[in-house]
A protein has these predicted regions:
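N-terminal localization/anchoring segments of enzymes in phospholipid and broader phosphate metabolism
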Residues: 1-268, 272, 276, 300, ...
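Cytochrome P450 I-helix active-site segment
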Residues: 143, 307, 311-318, 325-326, ...
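Histidine/acidic-residue-rich catalytic or RNA/ligand-binding cores of hydrolases
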Residues: 293, 322-324, 354, 372
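Thr-Gly-centered strand-to-loop micro-motif
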Residues: 284-285, 312, 342, 361-362
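Catalytic-core elements of nucleic-acid end-processing and repair enzymes
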Residues: 350
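Glycine- and other small-residue-rich loops at beta-strand/loop junctions that grip anionic moieties
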Residues: 94, 286-287, 321
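Helical hairpin unit composed of two closely spaced alpha helices linked by a short loop
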Residues: 287-308, 313, 318
Length: 430
């Protein structure tokens, strides 16, 4: 029986890997090659080389980026760009909840369909469980909106159910894209009441050719969901329009990661930033359940005099994850990492910055699920003025935090410490 299950799972994984590779082959042809986007920054050329060789993620020196430090700032900008759409709208989110915020978005999408704009919506079958019914799928179809559910929840045992589509990507006309920590639900924009009082998150808006990578990522994931499209070349070329240069400052590298590429791209970027830091590293993450390699890199950076600061929630979102995370935080504090507990509510932002010159923003948490199991995306930013705004947001956020001490850990309820220690053994599964 065990051999049968193993063989069945291996066959399924091989099929999925093959689908991923075929989808990449058909979409990456529309994304610039390294010769067209050579980095003007030799000090980061090794990372640029790695990202292209490992995932076909090119450097863009002609695109601009805008940072949003909260959902309230993101939402009106996002809504306006949806209204401005002329050709197509692609939305890929882990969570879409049919609440007030989604209804506002849906009204615009309905209007754009009547104007001839192609609208596609892709969402995860577990994250968006309330929208994952066949009935809701049919409802969107009745509005003229194409939709797909990635890996709907089924009663049949399937290890692939653990590999969720955790990405947050929006593409408008192939010229503008968004990514970050925000999903499409009320709490992310602080609409009405939520159990955390305030939800702190972040996002970026990309304008220019760098959007091509996000367009390709969306189409790849679209093809992995049910009923993949057979013809790429003729139907997909229109989603990659020619775009004039928008910026001559710094560079952007949009990137992604998943459980099937066996490259650990997301973690390797974190390790790279930590290894190159000369003054400081600032991180925000809602969860902290990491492997020994990343834990050691954080501790080593602190031990060589780098000011390493980590902002995490003070309140639990998922109780067991919170308990396990506390054991990792204790280890980091013991070894010189500054841990800040966010007090006003829940921080869901995923930022990784260093020395005021490099930063990442995206959907990636510092936990096993994001780093090794899920489909994720991010944006690497280098030597752009927007990094100053990101750094300023982090410093302002620290003012709303309490720095964690070992005494704080000792004062935790016994049940939190016990569960954390017991289940830390199973951290890769949580």
């Amino acid at each position: 029986i065990s051999l049968y299950i193993y063989t069945k799972m291996a066959t399924r994984n091989a099929r999925l890997k093959n689908k991923i590779e075929q989808s990449k082959i058909q979409t990456w042809k529309f994304v610039p090659k390294p010769t067209e986007t050579k980095s003007a920054f030799p000090e980061i050329s090794d990372l640029a080389f790695y990202l292209y060789e490992s995932g076909n993620f090119p450097v863009y020196t002609d695109s601009d980026v805008e940072y949003f430090s909260c959902g309230e700032d993101f939402f009106p900008d996002f809504m306006q760009e949806l209204k401005n759409a002329k050709e197509f709208i692609f939305l890929e989110f882990f969570i879409i909840t049919p609440d007030d915020s989604w209804q506002k978005i849906l009204e615009i999408l309905k209007q754009k369909v009547t104007e001839g704009v192609e609208v596609r919506v892709l969402y995860d079958g577990i994250g968006s469980v309330l929208a994952s019914t066949k009935l809701y799928h049919k409802y969107l179809a009745s509005l003229g909106i194409k939709s797909k559910i990635y890996m709907p929840l089924t009663p049949v045992f399937n290890l692939q159910q653990n590999n969720r589509d955790h990405r947050k990507i929006a593409v408008i006309d192939g010229k503008i894209s968004y990514t970050g920590g925000l999903n499409l639900a009320n709490e992310y924009f602080n609409f009405g009441q939520n159990k955390f009082s305030y939800w702190k998150d972040s996002a970026v808006k990309i304008r220019g050719n760098a959007t091509k990578t996000y367009t390709a990522l969306f189409l790849q994931m679209w093809n992995l969901a049910k009923f993949p499209e057979k013809k790429f070349n003729k139907s997909y070329e229109k989603f990659f329009p020619a775009i004039k240069e928008n910026s001559k400052e710094g560079l952007l590298i949009p990137y992604a990661d998943n459980a099937y590429n066996e490259k650990d791209i997301a973690e390797n970027i974190c390790l790279y930033i930590l290894s190159k830091a000369t003054r400081n590293v600032c991180i925000t993450t809602p969860y902290i359940i990491i492997d020994n390699q990343l834990k050691s890199a954080l501790i080593f950076a602190a031990s060589r005099g780098i000011n390493v600061s980590l902002i995490v929630p003070s309140k639990p979102d998922h109780f067991l994850t919170f308990c396990i995370g506390k054991t990792f935080l204790k280890t980091l504090v013991e070894n010189g990492v500054h841990v800040y507990l966010y007090l006003p509510g829940f921080i869901h932002s995923k930022l990784f910055t260093s020395d005021g010159k490099i930063a990442t923003v995206g959907s990636i948490n510092l936990d096993y699920r994001s780093l090794f199991h899920h489909f994720e995306d991010g944006l690497l930013i280098y030597k752009k003025s927007v990094i100053e705004k990101i750094q300023r947001d982090i410093e302002l956020t620290k003012l709303s935090c309490k720095e964690m001490t070992l005494d704080d850990y000792k004062k935790l309820p016994l049940i939190v410490k016990m569960l954390g220690r017991i289940f830390r053994i199973f951290a890769p599964l949580v």
